[in-house]
Amino acid sequence: MEQLVESLRALQVGEVRVNESLAHHTTWKIGGPADVFVIPNDIEGLKNTMKLIQETGCKWRVIGRGSNILVSDKGLRGVTIKLDKGLDHLEVNGESITVGAGFPVVKLATVISRQGLAGLEFAAGIPGSVGGAVFMNAGAHGSDISQILTKAHVLFPDGTLRWLTNEEMAFSYRTSLLQKNDGICVEAIFSLTRGDKEDIKKKLQKNKDYRRDTQPWNHPTCGSVFRNPLPEYAGQLIEKAGLKGYQIGGAQISTMHANFIVNTGDAKAADVLALIHHVKDTIQKQYQMNMETEVELIGER
């Protein structure tokens, strides 16, 4: 691993850190150390990082802003790559925008609204990055990424870069092709529509206000923990089961919205995991329903 670190630094791929606490890089503020942590300077830096990883055969993982993931207390082995400011470019071409994977979704929705472009209002309050949003087909308020994505620029582990169409991305509810294949979305093209700036601004603010009033943004959280077992809603089921406010260690089911687990200050991944299992067991016993997690559980157990 030391040789890999030296090689990464010699190639000047970006920031390279050793034993970096992932609690600093997740919205839950939870997670053990990454053996090697890389923040690429650009797409070329990411390509060179992946080339070295393939040559050494070590494990790897890509993260964005760290939402929608639960990193174990033991952390991640191998190389963790964070797509951040090196991949946060934005180009507007009429009603089409090309945006880097590291661009924050909330910021994008705000910036685009000021230019009179509609279609991203649903993303107000989504805590992740563009890359993560594409990866999981993030959505809210009746829309999702699949409704606006034209193409995704994907880097595969063998170093090839390909533009994948919306159809090739195989989107479904909170799912995309990238969850089944080892591709990394490095940028995306979204197709938006021209609209009235004031109308777009009002809709965006309405969605932001809804999230602020109904979801617990005063504590670290990852976003929604469970997928909605349609036509039911996960939060409503958990609340009906009497689990609002239930706490294990430093992890608590939010008293505002039961599909959120908050870090009250000193939560460990083990606390959150125990709480997730308790919810699943309770819902299974009371309603004979299997609750699937929307949050991804990663790292050494």
Curated annotation (Swiss-Prot):
Q: Where is the active site?
A: R174, S224, E294
- Which keywords describe this protein according to UniProt? Cell cycle, Cell division, Cell shape, Cell wall biogenesis/degradation, Cytoplasm, FAD, Flavoprotein, NADP, Oxidoreductase, Peptidoglycan synthesis
Q: Which domain of life is it from?
A: Bacteria
Tell me what reaction this enzyme catalyses.
Answer: UDP-N-acetyl-alpha-D-muramate + NADP(+) = UDP-N-acetyl-3-O-(1-carboxyvinyl)-alpha-D-glucosamine + NADPH + H(+)
Task: Please list the cofactors this protein needs.
Answer: FAD
Mention any Pfam family matching this sequence.
MurB_C
Q: Which cysteines are joined by disulfide bonds?
A: none
Where does this protein reside within or beyond the cell? Cytoplasm
Q: State its role.
A: Cell wall formation.
Query: Record's family?
Result: Belongs to the MurB family.
Name this polypeptide is given: UDP-N-acetylenolpyruvoylglucosamine reductase
Q: Which organism was this protein described from?
A: Halalkalibacterium halodurans (strain ATCC BAA-125 / DSM 18197 / FERM 7344 / JCM 9153 / C-125)
Q: What is the lineage of its organism?
A: Bacteria, Bacillati, Bacillota, Bacilli, Bacillales
